[in-house]
């Protein structure tokens, strides 16, 4: 599914901008990711090299929910679909697992988990995507739009 979510920030709208933003966040996220975020490590589909990307990662039990906001255009999603074994560093620790697309029957549970958690970092993130004052309801609506318009994944942790 191709994502339709647009932002007032042209930096976020470009593929290069997203990579640059992730690269800027990476050193901080490697030290201690904010609640609800993490560093996803994949294997490059063409090069076989290790690739790391900062992502919103919601851990619930032995599952972690992620969304490729830009849908199938997202490079890390293409890497995951080609080689589903991933490593994920979240606040609780570093885990390995197998990533797959969210199935229709588990979508309501995944949507609730993805949209439920709010941290301070979400308020900053909201200001990059939307104009206006960030409120919990507006942040959840933004996350729901990402989930509905993007490509949701679940990582089954080992």
Residue ranges and their predicted role:
Residues 2-11, 93-158:
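Charged, gly/pro-rich active-site loop segments
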Residues 33-36, 80-85, 149:
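A short, compositionally biased
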Residues 1-31:
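Extreme N-terminal tail/first-helix region
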Residues 26-33, 74-81, 143:
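Short linear motifs in intrinsically disordered
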Residues 24-27, 52-53, 139-141:
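A generic local structural motif
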Residues 35-69:
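Short beta-strand segments
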Residues 40-41, 84-96:
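Short conserved beta-strand and strand-loop elements enriched in small hydrophobics
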Residues 58-89:
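A short mixed-secondary-structure module that forms the rim of ligand-binding clefts
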């Amino acid at each position: 599914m191709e994502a339709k979510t647009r932002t007032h920030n042209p930096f976020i709208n470009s593929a290069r901008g997203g990579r640059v933003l992730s690269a800027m966040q990476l050193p901080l996220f490697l030290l201690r990711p904010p609640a609800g975020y993490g560093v996803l490590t994949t294997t490059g589909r063409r090069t076989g090299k290790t690739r790391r990307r900062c992502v919103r990662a919601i851990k619930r039990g032995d599952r972690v929910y992620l969304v490729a906001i830009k849908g199938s255009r997202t490079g890390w999603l293409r890497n995951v679909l080609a080689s589903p074994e991933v490593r994920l560093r979240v606040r609780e620790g570093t885990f390995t697992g197998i990533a797959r697309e969210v199935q229709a029957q588990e979508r309501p549970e995944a949507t609730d988990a993805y949209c439920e958690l709010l941290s301070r970092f979400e308020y900053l993130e909201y200001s990059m995507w939307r104009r206006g004052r960030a409120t919990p309801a507006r942040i959840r609506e933004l996350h729901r739009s990402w989930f509905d318009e993007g490509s949701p994944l679940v990582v089954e942790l080992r």
